[in-house]
Amino acid sequence: HAVSCFLTRGQLWQNWKHGRDVFDRKLVDSDWAPNNGNWLWLAGVAPFSMPYYRVYNPCPDSKSSLNVEAKEASFIRHWVPELASFPSRYIFEPHLAPDHVQEEAGCVIGTDYPSPIVDRKESRRVNLELFKESLGRIA
């Protein structure tokens, strides 16, 4: 959910077909019907879509119901070795860690690990306005 929402109506405002195509190529269990249906639904462009203002946070913290892993972030620590030494408090959004924490973890954001590509809150606000405006045009 978070990936498709981030790519489309949540933050990047990209066509849902780009994400669908990547999933078609990369998923081991890719299936045309559910892949298309899910991308349409989560992009908010299908008649059966969820309300456009429901935007998933791509960076859930350890307390979020959308966080499917333990507080320890073992999945991130295993698969993203650059972040393995970050304190749990910052591992979901390492760019928020103070400089001294990044240095102690051996990973400076913007040098050793990419900086965020968008301001998540601002892009969400702008995209919600765009979506609301586009719905007004077809009503």
Which residues does each PLM region occupy?
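C-terminal catalytic domain of photolyase/cryptochrome flavoproteins
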Residues: 1-139
